[in-house]
Amino acid sequence: MQLNSTEISELIKKRIAQFNVVSEAQSTGTIVSVSDGIIRIHGLADVMQGEMIELPGNRYAIALNLERDSVGAVVMGPYADLAEGMTVKCTGRILEVPVGKGLLGRVVNTLGQPIDGKGEIDNDGFSPVEVIAPGVIDRQSVDQPVQTGYKAVDSMVPIGRGQRELIIGDRQTGKTSLVIDAIIAQRDSGIKCIYVAIGQKASTIANVVRKLEEHGALANTIVVVASASESAALQYLAPYSGCAMGEYFRDRGEDALIVYDDLSKQAVAYRQISLLLRRPPGREAFPGDVFYLHSRLLERAARVNAEYVERFTNGAVTGRTGSLTALPIIETQAGDVSAFVPTNVISITDGQIFLESSLFNSGIRPAVNPGISVSRVGSAAQTKVIKKLSGGIRTALAQYRELAAFAQFASDLDDATRKQLSHGQKVTELLKQKQFAPMPVSEQALVLFAAEFGYLDGVELERISSFESALLAYANSNHADFMKDLAKSGNFNDSIQQELKTIVENFKKNGAW
């Protein structure tokens, strides 16, 4: 068969028409230096700030410094085998982490990958780690409580849903113990919890996970781990990853509680990255934007209104507000709260719980200093019964501290002063609490009622603890229905006051403590 020129021409045209080329332009660059987890890249003209850069070996780096002829990026993961001359690519994506209810009960790393050996995670999608916080119009005022289960905290420095309450103190003052108990207290409250461990020993984190599991709180909690052995980049990013996981619940009309343990170590990791990127150091060698590092994180903890939730879920959830409550932890050096990072975080948050070494060492645990601990918005969210009964507690402690200072020098004290000192000592003793024993509202109310209305007057100081446990055992066995109802409602009225009075008076007549 012989084809003439016209047929050949038609055949070529047909083939050309059918020829399909899929071309994709990709920005590539070359590594020019590698040191301490920081790589400098020549090229990548189209890279964005914070963009993920694909490295050889299925690894990524994040672009942090965009300079005229090079890009400074921080490697997420091992970097020992990276070398000059290797080719890297832009991805066009910002770092995202998996989110959803499938993460509850799991231990994950900064990138949301499981590290607990329980298999793959069934996530509901991905969310960027850096998100702009909700605006003023999208927010609602804080008016619902988060019960920590600690008498000292719930009575004097109450925390509301959507609040940011700083927990600050020296090392070994019970900061982590306090937040772990707060997470355990949320078992039946419906509040989902996220615990972000930054720069801690792996053994400490394993211990925390075990305690949460023992007390039935792990199923309600996501644990995000960037341990001390992880790179500075992963320690710096861990809080943002945890926050993205918490926002999943907030934006769908649910309540979540996130703990950052601790932000001092995150600031140190960020300082390390910044100095290696040759950014100019400022006070205490921290970079100039260390305030923004924490403010953009903590502003994402908020209570959002029903319109925001409805808009976010495209009408799937209506009439429900969502909240993300943050409990950041800051570790001070020798009680110095005027250092750079502590003052920054104090100014960003809605109050602080100050834990003192001297109180902790003298056996007062939780070691809350009621004088300088404050909650700026929590009182509006406090349960009615606790609010009504805790009014005299702070005053009694303040007067006791003032008088105790004078009592050291005065030999003869009048009866009124002695009575005040005795009452202050008993209240201090009453506010002590063992770890892993969070108290429901009803039990706190009963104990505070006994303190407020003078029922501790006939009890010796060393018998306060046994008096309290016997009173609670008596109330829970003989008035179980009332205690359950009070724990559920948290209301306070004349009939509830009368019932509390009856319980305490009958118990004191009994005298079995």
From Swiss-Prot:
It is an enzyme of class 7 (translocase). The record marks 373 as: Required for activity. It is found in: Cell inner membrane. It catalyses: ATP + H2O + 4 H(+)(in) = ADP + phosphate + 5 H(+)(out). SUPFAM superfamilies: C-terminal domain of alpha and beta subunits of F1 ATP synthase (SSF47917), N-terminal domain of alpha and beta subunits of F1 ATP synthase (SSF50615), P-loop containing nucleoside triphosphate hydrolases (SSF52540). CDD domains: ATP-synt_F1_alpha_C, ATP-synt_F1_alpha_N, F1-ATPase_alpha_CD. ATP binds at residues 169-176. It is a peripheral membrane protein. Keywords: ATP synthesis, ATP-binding, Cell inner membrane, Cell membrane, CF(1), Hydrogen ion transport, Ion transport, Membrane, Nucleotide-binding, Translocase, Transport. InterPro entries: ATP_synth_asu-like_sf, ATP_synth_asu_C, ATP_synth_asu_C_sf, ATP_synth_F1_a_nt-bd_dom, ATP_synth_F1_asu, ATPase_a/bsu_AS, ATPase_F1/V1/A1_a/bsu_N, ATPase_F1/V1/A1_a/bsu_N_sf. GO terms for molecular function: ADP binding; ATP binding; proton-transporting ATP synthase activity, rotational mechanism. Transmembrane segments: none annotated. GO terms for cellular component: plasma membrane; proton-transporting ATP synthase complex. It comes from the Bacteria. PROSITE patterns: ATPASE_ALPHA_BETA. Its EC number is 7.1.2.2. F-type ATPases have 2 components, CF(1) - the catalytic core - and CF(0) - the membrane proton channel. CF(1) has five subunits: alpha(3), beta(3), gamma(1), delta(1), epsilon(1). CF(0) has three main subunits: a(1), b(2) and c(9-12). The alpha and beta chains form an alternating ring which encloses part of the gamma chain. CF(1) is attached to CF(0) by a central stalk formed by the gamma and epsilon chains, while a peripheral stalk is formed by the delta and b chains. Produces ATP from ADP in the presence of a proton gradient across the membrane. The alpha chain is a regulatory subunit. Belongs to the ATPase alpha/beta chains family. This is ATP synthase subunit alpha. It comes from Haemophilus ducreyi (strain 35000HP / ATCC 700724). The lineage of its organism: Bacteria, Pseudomonadati, Pseudomonadota, Gammaproteobacteria, Pasteurellales.
